[in-house]
Amino acid sequence: MATAREIPLNRTRNIGIMAHIDAGKTTTTERVLYYTGVSHKMGEVHEGSAVMDWMEQEQERGITITSAATTCYWLGMDQQYPKHRINIIDTPGHVDFTIEVERSLRVLDGAVAVFCSVGGVEPQSETVWRQANRYHVPRLGFVNKMDRAGANFLRVVNQVKDRLNANPIPIQLPIGAEEDFKGVIDLIREKAIYWNEADRGRTYELADIPEDMKAEVQKWREKMIEAAAESSEELMDKYLEAGDLSPEQIRQGLRQRTLANEIVPILCGSAFKNKGVQALLDAVIDYLPSPTDVPAIRGEEDDGSEGSRSASDDEPFAALAFKIASDPFVGTLTFFRVYSGILKSGDSVYNPIKGKKERIGRLLQMHSNSREEIKEVRAGDIAAAVGLKTVTTGDTICNQQNIITLEKMDFPEPVISVAIEPKTKADQEKMGVALGKLAQEDPSFRVHTDEESAQTIIEGMGELHLEIIVDRMRREFNVEANVGKPRVAYRETIRRSIEQQGKYIRQTGGRGQYGDVWLRIEPREPGAGFEFENAIVGGVVPREYIPAVEKGVREQMENGIRAGYPVVDVKVTIFEGSYHDVDSSEMAFKIAGSMAFKEGASKADPVLLEPIMKVEVVTPEEYMGDVVGDLNRRRGMIQGMDESPAGKIVDVEVPLAEMFGYATDLRSLSQGRATYTMEFLKYAEAPSNIAEAIIKQQS
């Protein structure tokens, strides 16, 4: 048995705070750190000193890019709980960083969704919400900025219902709004809470509910109790008998339904004005899961069978690396979530994805950007290790005697690329090192060298993503670089099936070369990827040459069919062929496979695919006509229009190629008042006139 822990596992919460860019997520996190006693002076984003945003660019741009993990402790607003440990993973809200969000959601157990009381549910909130649904993450909602002009709590609650298809259950109501926002009503305790402004909200007083709010409170309290009662027959019977439930029963019922993802308890406040954050921390403890409340993580055992690891110190050690960060003081930091077992500093771990054993140097518990060295980590913990060389994002690290590979994360393919070159000879070598490190940290960022032009090409999820990479090269690695024009990552595919022979024979004195194959090349569903099948019977092509044929096909796919872009979504089957006892070789069959694919694919109705982006524009009504006209000129397909407090929302699908420089154009169209978000949606066939122009340009 493992030795007793300082804080039992059921008193640990691994949470993320997710939100749209300006909903006030970083300020909320800051206040959490302040009230839990970690942070002695509150950081403000608009002064550029927030604790969580520790990369320089984040402080300049005021947006959060890297998900730092922070540990803090909470005893409750009235010191009513035993000590709980809360690990907070900061998630970015900008759409170019969806990969960061995916990563953090993968290792959290619960989340707090922060909404702006004025902007409500923004397009970005919808994206993150969908991602959280995919990982079945239980959530609380916090309607922030209740002190802002235009604040409206119930409107946001309705948007959570209508736009996010969630079931919001307010457990608080605001007292007043805008500059009259004074405090909140706790619907469970039936009390008003007023935070004391003199000590920055550290103390508060409980008071009776204001007369003019009693009817409203009664209405929402009943909805909340009904939601709690629906958690079990037992509670429902008690409610029907007594017409009420005790505070403990309400919390128990709400917790059960939150963990089952049936409801989202909603709270409100103003983080900036120090109102409501401690009550939010209490709700994290009351309603969000501990590692023991979530299902055991699944994975693949060493023998290929399905296995799992439950959150216990007594199980074999298994953890998932979810973030790699370069740190100026200690080198590479690997952030990981422990799912089972115990790891001590100095232990060796096994990485089944890379097939490598590594020794853990130091273990650090992170407080945003300061660090505390610890001796061990246990199931449910989140920590950072120093000194791991081969581990990349999404890898498993585990006990060597009990190998398991935890489910890998899926990372999106990059959709945009730019050529980049160092400004001076001295920068040349440093640039290679810098790009390598950045690619190790961020799986949605790729680097390769273009064979023809010998240029270094970097690829990513959007213009902002690549701008920040170039910016980090300059700051962290002192590399100055010139950046080319952004280029779109087109793809090619085929529309019909074909059978094609590829025969490679060279007989010129001495040993010749002989490879002969017949391939069937067929289109697959969009997004289905590449499949290679061996249907050879009777050994007409010996088995040892089959991998060479596949290799030849794959290499030719990288070179494209008509325009030199990678081919996707095809199935290739080798079904016939012949060989020569002496002259056949892997090389010959690789060339034969490559020839057959090149020849066959070019006759199979090849088409060019272009990335289509899902774009949402929010614009004041008076610019609506210009904005829509401009989107139509960009080959946009309008999918729908909606109203929001910030103006009209236009939902549109636009080819990425037409979106370069859109930020600047939109600013001038709307005098800086319209905003947009953009994320990759799918690849679709480019119209023939566009495709022809691109092919011509390529050749």
Swiss-Prot record:
Record SMART domains: EFG_C (SM00838), EFG_IV (SM00889)
Keywords for the protein's UniProt record, in alphabetical order: Cytoplasm, Elongation factor, GTP-binding, Nucleotide-binding, Protein biosynthesis
Subcellular location: Cytoplasm
GO molecular function: GTP binding; GTPase activity; guanosine tetraphosphate binding; translation elongation factor activity
Cross-referenced Pfam families: EFG_C, EFG_III, EFG_IV, GTP_EFTU, GTP_EFTU_D2
Keyword field contains Cytoplasm: yes
Highest taxon of source: Bacteria
Protein name per its UniProtKB record: Elongation factor G
Gene name as annotated: fusA
